[in-house]
Design a protein with these regions (language model features):
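Flavin-dependent oxidoreductase catalytic cores
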Residues: 1-177
């Protein structure tokens, strides 16, 4: 995930055709998709999980993610799953001998807020970005399902999101335990 996310990032300034412009940043992820699709055929679902917002200075935003989503839908991906944050760019420096951990900075909080959240949330922190990205995909003429994840606190909220057309699928695990 992190390697391809690095290529998609607005911070990717590679000058070898795999960065700088949106087309350049999309090049490797689309090449990977084409290779996977070529191996598994059309009767196997292939999609992509990517960041709706990197939540770092100069990083990709929801507007960027909407353009990425449309490109992925155009390429034929079967679903688009959205997350956010969790970047090493703003993580705290590890102590000597310890591994770097991406969930210690502001973008980490956006990805894994349970470390400092409480009964007030944040709940459904990816709903608005996912809905905006889904709307962009639909406006471009694609019906590619969009998966919302992140802070969905239960089945009632998940059902409401589907009923309201804010997402096509809801991904959560911990909440169902």
């Amino acid at each position: 995930r992190d390697e391809l996310a690095s290529f998609l990032s607005a911070t990717n300034m590679r000058a070898d055709g795999y960065g700088q412009t949106l087309a350049g940043r999309l090049r490797l992820p689309l090449d990977v998709y084409d290779a996977v699709r070529g191996r598994v055929g059309t009767d196997f679902p292939v999609g992509c999980r990517f960041l709706a917002d990197e939540c770092i200075a100069g990083g990709s935003t929801v507007t960027d993610a909407a353009q990425i989503a449309v490109a992925f839908a155009r390429a034929g991906m079967d679903f688009l799953s959205l997350s956010r944050g969790g970047k090493f760019d703003d993580a705290l420096q590890p102590k000597v001998g310890e591994a770097a951990y991406p969930y210690t900075g502001p973008s980490g909080y956006e990805c894994m807020p349970q470390y400092i959240s409480d009964e007030r949330g944040p709940f459904g922190r990816n709903v608005d970005p996912a809905s905006r990205i889904r709307n962009a995909v639909r406006a471009a003429g694609f019906a590619t399902p969009v998966v919302v994840t992140g802070g969905i606190h239960g089945y009632a909220q998940a059902e409401a999101l589907l009923r309201e057309g804010k997402a096509d699928l809801v991904g959560f695990a911990r909440q169902s335990l």
